[in-house]
Amino acid sequence: MLRTLTALVALALAHGPPAADPVVHWRHSTSLGRPDHGSLVNGVQLPAEGITFFTWDPVLLRSPDRGSRRWGNDRLVRMVQEVVGEYWLENPDAPRVCIGDLSRRHGGDFQPKHASHQNGLDVDVYYPRLDRRERPPIRPAQIDRPLAQDLVNRFIAAGATRIFVGPNTHLKGPRRIVQVLVLHDNHMHVRIAGP
């Protein structure tokens, strides 16, 4: 992780004025129950944006995502930051990664929009766009598939246990991990294992 952070700082300095990532208040989290019926203890809040990512509110259709929708298990928040950091280092011309909802501060029911996301182990990651705009794609034809596949591969390598992708994205991975699910043509749903 230190190597990744050092490289990110060097890359940020090479691309103009330094942009500091906001401080994350790390603590050990506990995810209880199931993704569709659970809670989160000592969640960690993902910052609204950073050097390598920004957040998107799928209800208000704007950036950043509200703070109440950006809580996750510490392992999930760390994974997101590491994956998008390494992705950005390998794809420096790519736009920042668009991160959607995680969970609520204490987990629990997360309506509208989500049947899961209740115990801090789920995150929505929007597919990169061909036009490089920093907003979610509206149609699958707008997806930069090589960059999207790169993100899928990185989340698999980082230990994701499930990644739901849309039927029209044509993204691939091991069947036990990457599964096609309707209503996921503009974002992937990444899940990590519970404790």
Where on the chain are the PLM-derived regions?
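Soluble periplasmic/extracytoplasmic beta-strand elements of cell-envelope proteins
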Residues: 98-100, 122-126, 189-191
